[in-house]
Each structure stands twice: as C-alpha cells, then as structure tokens.
Amino acid sequence: MGSAGLIEIKRRIKSVESTRKITNAMGLVATSKLRKTRKELFINKKFFEETEKIIEKLASTISQDDDSIYFKSNKSKYKLYILVSSDTGLCGSYNNTVVSYLDSLVRDEKENIKVITVGSKGLSYVKRIGLDTIADYVDIPDIPTVKEVKIVFESALKMYKDGEVSEINIVYLDFVSPVKQEPKAEKLLPIERITSVPEEFITEPNSEEVLNNALNIHLKGKFRNILLSAKCSEQSSRMTAMNGATQNANDILDNLNLKYNRIRQQIITQEISEIVGGAEAQK
C-alpha cells in the first residue's frame, strides 16, 4: 500500500474525527440536561412526599365505604398502560428496555390492554410487540411542566371515570443513579386503602371533598415525578451511549494513526533504499 493508501487512511481519520466531535458534544449536552433534570426531580420529589403525608392523614378520616373513584375500581375488563419513552434516539437500549418490560407485564392479556405512549419512539416499539395505542403524546420537554402532565393525566383519568378501564398503570425506566436505571410499573389508579390510626382535625368544606381535591393534585405530582425520573434515565442512557461512541472513535483513531505511521515509515524506508541502490549503481 503506497501513497494512495495514505490518502484513504487520512480520509477515514478525518471522518472519524468529525464523528467524535459530534458524539462528544452530544455527551456533554446530555450530561448538562441530566444535571438540570435531576435537580428538578429532587424538588418535585420533596413536594410529592409532603402531599403523600397529607393524603395519609386525610384518608384515615374517610369511611372504608366511601365510593370515591380514586379508591373504588370499576368492572371494566380493560387495563390502561401509559408507556413513557423518548422523543429522540441515540440513547442506547433505553426504549427497548422499557418496551420489553411492558411486554413481560401484559404478554398473557394483550387483548385486554389499552396503551397510551408518551414520547414518539414508543409508538413503533409498541407495534413490534403486537399492541396498538389509543393516544400518543410527543414533544415532551426535557423538564416536563404541569401543562404536559395535566394533558396526559386528565385524558387517562377520564377513561377511568367513564368506566373504560379499571386500572391506570405507568411503565417507565426509573432513575436510580447515572449508571443504573431500572424498568418499573406504577399503579396510578385505583389507590389502595391506607390503614392508619385516624387523626382528628377539622376540614372545610368536608373531608371527602378536600381528599378528592388533594388526591388530584397528588396524582399529578406523582405522574410528574415519574416523567422526570424517566427523563433522567433517558439522559443517562444517552450520556453513556455517546461517551461509549466517543471512546470507540478514539480507539479507531489510534489504530488508524498507527497504521498511517507504519505505512508512511515503509514508504520512507523504500525511498531511502531506492536512493542508496541508485547511488551504488553509479559507482
């Protein structure tokens, strides 16, 4: 391989260097987004935990016979699953992991399952496991606001109130740490009865109405918490994937540079040999 080979290797080096710049930049962006989303998750989690304490206190004052829709299931044979996926790719096995987990949960009862996807990537993945979606929500921001939460939650809640589904479950990739994310399913409705010692306190207008209003706020907070956790997992997966791609690019560049220098050395050695050979021939 002569100078033509060197030109080809230089072209490949330039191409890999361009790719490395892109993957490195995307990795840095994912790291920055993860930091911001984790901060928001921490704040929202505190809010969620405080509302949960209030719910427990209020629920202890309500009769077990209370027919609130939040506690009482209906007779529908259908269950609703909200699948949280990503809107963009390049995040490793993130979407495949969460969809595979959904498949493991509903494999034996797919005819009784209704699915809502959050994130554009979920739609195609869900079809691969033989499920259709009844609604799809896309372009969810990196830090979901109350607006996005309200749209999805109220759509699902209406189906539950109308008796179309007997359960609302959310399947997502739970954020544990930047290097660990676990697929998880959370049942949003119906809520299990909380058994605790009743506390005596005054509520206006009445405990039932206050509890229902508080539950609505609490469930939206829980849903937002789940979306934020899923977004953290997405950015972690993307950060890991891009860092891995950047490292692979570095390894390829090392091999190409080594190959380039070896060929260049061979060419120089050959040229020196030809010069020496020519000089010897003229003696």
From Swiss-Prot:
Transport is among the record's keywords: yes
GO MF annotation list: ATP binding; proton-transporting ATP synthase activity, rotational mechanism
Species of the source: Clostridium botulinum (strain Alaska E43 / Type E3)
Cited PANTHER family: ATP SYNTHASE GAMMA CHAIN, ATP SYNTHASE SUBUNIT GAMMA, MITOCHONDRIAL
Quaternary state and interactors: F-type ATPases have 2 components, CF(1) - the catalytic core - and CF(0) - the membrane proton channel. CF(1) has five subunits: alpha(3), beta(3), gamma(1), delta(1), epsilon(1). CF(0) has three main subunits: a, b and c.
UniProt topology in membrane: Peripheral membrane protein
Localization terms from the record: Cell membrane
One GO cellular component term: plasma membrane
Protein name per its UniProtKB record: ATP synthase gamma chain
Coiled-coil stretches noted in the UniProt entry, renumbered to this chain: none
